[in-house]
Amino acid sequence: MLLSKDVMSPVPDLLKRITIDANRMHGRPCIRGLRVTVADILGLLSAGQSRETILQEYPYLEAADIDAVLAFAARQADHPIIAAE
């Protein structure tokens, strides 16, 4: 399941948690304006870290932040690429 059981908000509301600011973290997508990037959390998840461990190591993050990271990544991966002819 993409969303945690305690999150009832639809994906567009989750995506509001992802911020992009050219003056923060070189414009990379961050969580709620914090200095934690989407790539940071994706890297931890892909390395096998559990959501619970990530939330313990980053106590200022919420379960919905991890849901937002996954929703953002899914949207980014779904962008079509059109080849130039």
What residues fall within each predicted segment?
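Small, basic N-terminal interaction modules of short regulatory proteins
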Residues: 1-85
